[in-house]
Amino acid sequence: MIKVGDKLPSMELTVMGEKGPEPIKTDDIFLGKKVVMFAVPGAFTPGCSMTHLPGFAVNADKIKAAGVDSIVCLAVNDAFVMGAWGKDQNADEIIMLADGCGMFTEALGLVLDLSAMQLGKRSKRYAMIVNDGVVELLNIDESNIEASSAETILAALK
């Protein structure tokens, strides 16, 4: 599993562009920048839609004022779903990153297997602060949204 001090893997993921899904390299997102990335088990799921993503959307200006260049939300969903979820949640200040096949999540060692619930392999709920591609903070939530909440990450940035 990835840990503080590790460099994020270089991979290609997807975002929803104006004309459809567009590839984006993790190096383009993280290298030379300070980034807050949080991951959720699934777009449009209750905890993710009522608490996790809205917390970052509401606090986006404060997070960026604390020296963060970008905020990224990642899920093992496709770009169409991530794009629609971002619009639904008014998450204009957040890069909605699709890890459609879960390869990035697997490379991080942060897979959550929800096959017993017919949801397949997803991402664990976490948040990290990444500086120039290197993990500075990694908070993983096993159940409730606490360690990976926007408020907790904002406090860590101060």
Regions picked out by a protein language model, each given a short descriptive name:
Residues 1-158:
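Chalcogenol-based redox active-site neighborhoods
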